[in-house]
Structure formats: C-alpha cells, structure tokens
Amino acid sequence: VKGVLNFMVTRAKIPVHTVNAAYMIRPGIGFIRLESFGMKTHEEFMEAVEKLKQQGMKRLILDLQDNGGGFLEAAVRIANEFLQDNDMIVYTEGRRVSRQNYKARGNGRLKDIPVYVLVNELSASAAEIVSGAIMDNDRGTLIGRRTFGKGLVQRPFELPDGSMIRLTVAHYYIPSGRCIQKP
C-alpha cells in the first residue's frame, strides 16, 4: 500500500467481568471462578452467590486458579464474606510503613457455607490474600499447588518529568504472620 491510510478510532467502554463462571456442579454444590479482583468483583461475586443460593447451594467451590490478583479492597471484601467478626484477613507492614490490619466486620453472608478454594502456581496477590485468610481462619479447605508468592505493597510515585515509578513500601502478611512474598 502506498501513501498514508487514515483511520477514525472511536473509543468505547468495554465491560470487564471478573466472575467468569458461576453454576451448580451438582445439587447443593456451587462453583464460582474469579479471574481477577477488580472494582466490581465483590458486586459480581455476590450476584453469583445469590443466584446459586436460590438454586440450593449448600457448599461452594471458589476457583482462584490462574487469578493474578488485583485490588486489595476487592480481596478484603470477598474474604469478609466468609469470616467471623474481627477475624484477621491480612495485614501490611514495611520498614517505613506502620502495620495496617484488615479485619472481617462480621457481616459476611457466607460465614456458614463450607468453602473449598482452588489455587495453583499462578494464583497471586489478592488471590493469595483471600485463600490465606480462609486457610488461616480455618474457614475452608485449600486445594491445589503452591501459589505464586506475590506479596508486595507497591505505591506509584510521580517523577518531575511526569513519569511514574512504583516502589515497594510494604509486604502482605496472612493471619498466621507468614509473608506472602516468595523469597
């Protein structure tokens, strides 16, 4: 092709859904797969839970395999649904960043439903926070392989030229006190 080709590109919002599967495996057993932890994950997750409860869900398989993580707040909100009041979900701590605890508020709607969490070597960050909170609070059973080990809290810092750099300021720790970050 000779010459210049001009194109008009129209930007559109593309909805990104983080719950990419939710169904009954057999009577009484629901299955939900979370692909990542985004801004609407909790809302999507609870919609899926309510539909499965209406179909008679008594147990839940939560699939976090290949889930690379996402927003801390989304992970905390999901974990809260399974835990009792004041149960530790995760805490962060760094050399120059004081410890910050994230605890369950006791208003979770899945506190009495047995849960089985599927994880693998690509389950990272927020997925490790949820699975770690469920495991350390004896709230469910983890099934699978050792997770990725991404437990860094990173903050963006703007540089004078307008660019940004993300620096590690703290680490994530599951309730047992174990750091998620792989050495």
Regions found by a protein language model. Name each.
Residues D161-A170:
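Short acidic, Pro/Gly- and aromatic-enriched capping/linker segments at domain boundaries
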Residues K2-G3, M164, C179:
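Short, solvent-exposed loop/turn motifs
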Residues A124, Y172-I174:
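Short Gly/Pro-enriched loop/turn and capping motifs at secondary-structure junctions
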